[in-house]
């Protein structure tokens, strides 16, 4: 969607997001960022809204895009991504590959390993944003997003 101003354009963006049907289940954040860099010629503020779970490295694409545009990363995630609930056997499915498996969430060792993976992943993600000079915010789906966004925008001013 090309950048424009006005209420009508905002409603179009919302409609496009609601009606969007992905052509593929796989994620390639780097490809989306490269498209932004090539397609939008004039400098703009681009909001990158994602869970940022991607097997591919997109740091270079993000750095290049942020030199040309003002990129703001907004990570949205469910709290259970950070801390698995203790509910016994849980069937999990990789949304991209369709691979399913059962994990025993009653095991403290399993929950700790997952939590450690999440913390490491978040540290790597923050490192990517810092080295790319991209402002970012992480928002849980069960949190009030307004205060998080207000803090981000206050920091940017």
What are the residue ranges of the model-derived segments?
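A short alpha->loop->secondary-structure connector
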Residues: 1-11
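Von Willebrand factor
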Residues: 9-44, 56, 78
């Amino acid at each position: 969607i090309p950048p424009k101003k006005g209420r009508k354009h905002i409603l179009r963006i919302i409609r496009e997001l609601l009606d969007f049907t992905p052509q593929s289940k796989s994620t390639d954040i780097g490809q989306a960022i490269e498209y932004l860099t090539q397609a939008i010629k004039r400098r703009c503020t681009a909001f990158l809204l994602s869970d940022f779970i991607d097997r591919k490295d997109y740091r270079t694409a993000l750095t290049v895009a942020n030199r040309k545009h003002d990129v703001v990363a907004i990570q949205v995630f469910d709290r259970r991504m950070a801390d698995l609930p203790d509910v016994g056997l849980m069937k999990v499915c990789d949304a991209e590959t369709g691979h399913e498996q059962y994990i025993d969430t009653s095991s403290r060792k399993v929950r700790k390993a997952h939590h450690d993976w999440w913390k490491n992943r978040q540290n790597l993600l923050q490192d990517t944003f810092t080295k790319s000079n991209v402002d970012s915010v992480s928002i849980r789906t069960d949190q009030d997003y307004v205060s998080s966004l207000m803090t981000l925008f206050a920091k940017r001013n």
